[in-house]
Regions:
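Conserved short alpha-helical segments that host acidic/polar catalytic motifs at enzyme active sites
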Residues: 1-204
């Protein structure tokens, strides 16, 4: 399983991103990650959280990261978010879900010109990387998200962070929630669970 949290703010978002992601810690026990975008571009931190909680592992990163846009995740499988450079531009991506037909999609990707995927421990393909590759098969991020959702057998919710903003997509059949909250200061967030943003002063 896992969970994710994203923030779009006119000011620095790192505080809200840190705690919003941390509030999803009960959904995963292996990896945690955050990416922010600001004047210096993308900044990312990923840590193993198997032997120490998210908050402890990321407290030093929070002091160094700066940005008004950010996404974070708790993952029970692969390290993420990933930062991708493609014909669609640079973006960071985080996913929650399961791809049942991953082998067929990888085989099709090789047939259509994708040259390689990075293997994780155990020989598995990173499903977040595969999702990014599917998105990149189209001419825009929204079209790519719709395409990925149409060919994935399973359930895949995702957050994409670009220099312009955040794309949030619930899985095609609505099995997993994606909720949007608004703060009185105008900041917006997207979350896997509403209590995570309620604790930060965001409203439904």
């Amino acid at each position: 399983m896992g969970g994710f949290f994203g923030v779009a703010s006119k000011s620095d978002c790192v505080f809200d991103l840190f705690f919003g992601t941390d509030y999803h810690s009960h959904l995963g026990t292996k990896r945690g990650g955050m990416v922010v975008y600001g004047k210096d571009g993308f900044e990312r931190a990923i840590h193993n959280i198997e032997n120490a909680p998210f908050r402890t592992k990321f407290e030093h990163d929070v002091d160094e990261m700066k940005g008004n846009l950010g996404i974070g995740c708790i993952s029970d499988t692969e390290p993420q978010p990933l930062i991708v450079r493609s014909h669609l531009g640079n973006f960071a991506i985080s996913t929650v879900g399961r791809i049942n037909n991953i082998d067929a999609l990888v085989k099709e990707a090789f047939t259509n010109g994708t040259t390689h995927f990075l293997e994780m421990s155990g020989g598995d393909i990173n499903p977040t990387e595969l999702t990014a590759a599917l998105i990149n098969r189209r001419d825009s991020i929204p079209e790519g998200i719709r395409y990925a959702q149409s060919v994935i057998d399973g359930s895949m919710s995702m957050l994409l962070l670009t220099p312009e903003g955040i794309y949030a997509a619930r899985d095609r059949l609505g099995r997993l929630p994606v909720l949007v909250g608004k703060h009185p200061d105008g900041s917006l967030c997207v979350s896997f669970e509403s209590f995570a943003y309620h604790k930060l002063g965001y409203e439904d």
